[in-house]
Structure formats: structure tokens, C-alpha cells
């Protein structure tokens, strides 16, 4: 992250204020303030992760993934015979915190701040699937989009989607 000296000074002052406003996280803010003031390039890359962005297209894809899981769960619930399909297979797991942190952060924002998909169970890991999921979800979306009745899926269609 490239910053002018003026930008670094402003950000350093912001971290100094946050230290006073949020004493519970004061150590974290003091650390970030030191990194900014001294211009430690390696550690400044951490800010790239904090201040990164998701494109509108990526946000819409994440919402589409969540919507697919909503449709899967509703369809599974409405099946007369759901035998052979474990409920865990139609439950949204989230994204991997280690490799897909931006997607995970957006999911948490959508559920916890925006109040959407509040019926999703965050589990004990807060939507951290602990394994990369993006490519799997892309394959699943392709199959789901090909289904004629996306919110009234048959058991065969559900199986095709979750096994994609």
C-alpha cells in the first residue's frame, strides 16, 4: 500500500484516537500506528487486507451463493422424502478464513450487520468453512442456474447441485 507522508500522518492520528475510543483494542491500534508511522512495508501489507475491496460483481456472486443455499434448504424442507440427503449438505458452510477472508467478511457483514439470511447457522466457526469453497460454489451455481425451478428443486436436482 503506497501512502504519502500526509496520508500516513492522518492514519496514524486516526489510530491514536481509536486507541482512546476503544480501549479493549488499544494494543492493536498502537501496533498499527507504529507500523504506519515508521513505514514498515511488510506489515503495511496487512492494511491491504483490512482496506481491501470486493467488486460489485463479486458481492453479487456471494449473495447468489447464499441465495442458492437458501433455495436448497427450502427445497429440501419441502421434499416429501428427503431420505438420502443429509441436512448438512444443504447448509451453507461459508468460506475459508485463511484463503477467502474477504468473502467470509462479506458473508458476516450480510448476516450480522445487514440482517440478511439471518436464518443461516453460523455454527461454532462463524461461517469459516476451514477449507476453500469458492470453486466448489461456482460449480454448484452453474448447475443451480440451469434448473428451471430454482426454488422448488427435486431431490435429483438437489443431489446434482451439492455433488457438482
Curated annotation (Swiss-Prot):
InterPro entries: UPF0304_YfbU (IPR005587), YfbU_alpha-helical_sf (IPR023146), YfbU_helix-hairpin_sf (IPR023145). It holds the Pfam family YfbU. Disulfide bonds: none annotated. SUPFAM superfamilies: YfbU-like. It comes from the Bacteria. Belongs to the UPF0304 family. This is UPF0304 protein KPK_1463. It comes from Klebsiella pneumoniae (strain 342).
Amino acid at each position: 500500500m503506497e501512502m504519502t507522508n500526509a496520508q500516513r500522518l492522518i492514519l496514524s492520528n486516526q489510530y491514536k484516537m481509536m486507541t482512546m475510543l476503544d480501549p479493549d483494542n488499544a494494543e492493536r491500534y498502537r501496533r498499527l500506528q507504529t507500523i504506519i508511522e515508521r513505514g514498515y512495508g511488510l506489515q503495511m501489507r496487512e492494511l491491504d487486507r483490512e482496506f481491501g475491496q470486493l467488486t460489485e460483481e463479486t458481492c453479487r456472486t456471494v449473495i447468489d451463493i447464499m441465495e442458492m443455499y437458501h433455495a436448497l434448504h427450502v427445497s429440501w424442507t419441502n421434499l416429501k422424502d428427503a431420505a438420502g440427503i443429509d441436512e448438512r449438505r444443504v447448509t451453507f458452510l461459508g468460506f475459508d478464513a485463511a484463503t477467502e477472508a474477504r468473502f467470509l467478511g462479506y458473508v458476516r457483514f450480510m448476516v450480522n450487520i445487514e440482517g440478511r439470511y439471518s436464518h443461516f447457522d453460523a455454527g461454532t466457526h462463524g461461517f469459516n468453512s476451514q477449507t476453500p469453497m469458492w470453486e466448489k460454489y461456482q460449480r454448484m451455481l452453474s448447475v443451480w442456474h440451469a434448473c428451471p425451478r430454482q426454488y422448488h428443486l427435486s431431490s435429483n436436482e438437489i443431489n446434482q447441485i451439492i455433488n457438482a
